[in-house]
């Protein structure tokens, strides 16, 4: 498995991460087999959130690996907090309580990475800074990041937060590539030129923040998977051509497209199918040519000026 450095930290992580949002769909034996396979393949970075399965996903994961200090040393654990029923909450009290709950469910005494899940309109950076400082001093969290945040929101946090923001988890796929399209279509009068995220892609590259694409196979907001969809015939034809050329599956090509971008992204793979996970891992050893990358981009309906 190819590795990358997470943001500006010294943490070396796999080029793809395992998303655990759906691990509660597996029984204990299936969960054990899935996590064991991931570890054997070098995919030892696991992404969680306190809301996944109402907390059950973290508990199921810990039981599946029979969490103990030896097992814990072999993996990198990331979780997220800040989403509550009907609201978002970045208060110091909620962040600290959330981390304690996460650690209890995961049966560990520290997280490698904590992300703030979705922007809180009522965020007070000073409060977040106090929470981060306390978590760092106590050893409960080693690195910090965000999810679904634009450059100004990150800079607002950094006004008070002294720890580096090492990751930003963002929705990104071949068919959900507005952050790429707006950069390509600068100074053009078309829908693709509309900048909806404050140039977050370039911002993250400038500030050594690793982008973690979530839902890398989805189109729209959980409308469906583009692979094999009759809504994207040209895209699937092109992906299938490349899959045949590289002797891999279409799943591998979809992830290879993200990894070809020089931003050094770390896609979050949400599948609970071990074979599909292996296909995603194979993408770390494939480098699409520049021409192939653009062919896939255009086949998805994205335009060039």
PLM region spans:
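A structural motif
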Residues: 43, 108-111, 141, 165
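Acidic-and-aromatic substrate-binding clefts and catalytic sites of carbohydrate-active enzymes
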Residues: 23-29, 49-59, 84-89, 120-124, ...
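Structural motif corresponding to the early beta-alpha repeats
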Residues: 71-93, 117-118
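N-terminal binding-site loop/beta-alpha segment at the start of enzyme catalytic domains
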Residues: 1-75, 137, 218-220
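Conserved beta-strand positions
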Residues: 18, 48, 79, 113-116, ...
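Beta/alpha (TIM)-barrel catalytic core signal, keyed to glycine-rich beta->alpha loops juxtaposed to Asp/Glu
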Residues: 125-305
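Short, acidic/polar
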Residues: 26-38, 90-106, 152-155
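Active-site groove signature of glycoside hydrolases
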Residues: 103-124
């Amino acid at each position: 498995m190819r590795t990358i450095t997470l943001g500006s930290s010294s943490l070396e992580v796999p080029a793809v991460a395992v998303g655990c949002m759906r691990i509660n769909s597996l029984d204990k034996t299936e969960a054990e087999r899935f996590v064991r396979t991931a570890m054997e393949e070098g995919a030892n970075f696991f992404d969680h959130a306190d809301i996944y399965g109402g907390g059950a996903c973290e508990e199921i994961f810990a039981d599946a690996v029979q969490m103990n200090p030896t097992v814990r040393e072999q993996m990198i654990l990331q979780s997220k907090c800040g989403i509550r029923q009907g609201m978002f909450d970045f208060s110091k009290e909620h962040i600290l309580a959330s981390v304690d709950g996460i650690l209890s469910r995961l049966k560990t005494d520290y997280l490698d990475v904590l992300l703030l899940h979705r922007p809180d309109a009522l965020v007070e950076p000073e409060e977040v800074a106090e929470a981060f400082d306390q978590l760092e001093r106590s050893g409960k969290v080693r690195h910090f990041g965000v999810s679904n945040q634009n450059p100004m929101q990150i800079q607002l946090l950094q006004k008070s937060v002294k720890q580096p923001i090492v990751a930003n988890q963002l929705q990104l796929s071949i068919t959900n590539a507005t952050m790429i399209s707006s950069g390509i279509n600068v100074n053009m009068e078309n829908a693709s030129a509309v900048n909806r995220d404050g140039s977050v892609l370039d911002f993250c590259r400038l500030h050594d923040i690793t982008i973690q694409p979530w839902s890398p196979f989805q189109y729209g907001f959980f409308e469906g998977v583009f692979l094999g969809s009759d809504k994207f015939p040209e895209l699937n034809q092109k992906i299938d051509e490349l899959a045949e050329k590289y002797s891999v599956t279409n799943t591998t090509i979809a992830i290879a497209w993200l990894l070809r971008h020089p931003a050094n992204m770390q896609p979050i793979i949400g599948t609970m199918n071990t074979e599909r996970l292996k296909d995603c891992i194979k993408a770390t050893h494939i480098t699409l040519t520049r021409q192939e990358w653009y062919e896939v981009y255009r086949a998805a309906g994205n335009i060039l000026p």
